[in-house]
């Protein structure tokens, strides 16, 4: 098991975001923070890190539980814990 992993790869393997290219685009737009700091696609993440991801009007806060190079669909949800999900009003 890896001790660190690129953010874009983690998001894809954990299925928080379905494709690595989409994860990269979201990070490049500044919509992902790791431990309170805006992250780039190549930012290394580790177990215990807290992610905040903005998907349009939705903000998801998740804690990384473990890193896996590959994970089956059933195992992917064990890689993180959702701490909070909230909706925002983007029109404000």
Swiss-Prot record:
Source species, domain of life: Bacteria
CDD domains per the UniProt record, alphabetical: S4
Domain S4 RNA-binding: from-to ranges: 5-65
UniProt keyword tRNA-binding present: yes
RNA-binding among keywords: yes
Molecular function, one GO term: rRNA binding
Keyword terms of this UniProt record: Protein biosynthesis, RNA-binding, rRNA-binding, tRNA-binding
GO biological process: translation
Coiled-coil residues: none
One Pfam family here: S4
Functional description taken from the UniProt entry: Key component of the ribosome quality control system (RQC), a ribosome-associated complex that mediates the extraction of incompletely synthesized nascent chains from stalled ribosomes and their subsequent degradation. RqcH recruits Ala-charged tRNA, and with RqcP directs the elongation of stalled nascent chains on 50S ribosomal subunits, leading to non-templated C-terminal alanine extensions (Ala tail). The Ala tail promotes nascent chain degradation. RqcP is associated with the translocation-like movement of the peptidyl-tRNA from the A-site into the P-site.
Family: Belongs to the RqcP family.
Description of how the protein assembles with itself and partners: Associates with stalled 50S ribosomal subunits. Binds to RqcH, 23S rRNA and the P-site tRNA. Does not require RqcH for association with 50S subunits.
Full protein name: RQC P-site tRNA stabilizing factor
Gene: rqcP
């Amino acid at each position: 098991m890896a001790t660190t992993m690129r953010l874009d790869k983690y998001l894809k393997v954990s299925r928080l975001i379905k494709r690595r290219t989409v994860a990269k685009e979201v990070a490049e737009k500044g919509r992902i923070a790791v431990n309170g700091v805006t992250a780039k696609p190549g930012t290394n993440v580790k177990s215990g890190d807290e992610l905040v991801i903005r998907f349009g009007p939705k903000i998801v806060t998740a804690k990384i539980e473990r890193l896996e190079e590959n994970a089956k669909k059933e195992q992917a949800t064990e890689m993180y814990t959702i701490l909070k999900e909230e909706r925002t009003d983007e029109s404000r």
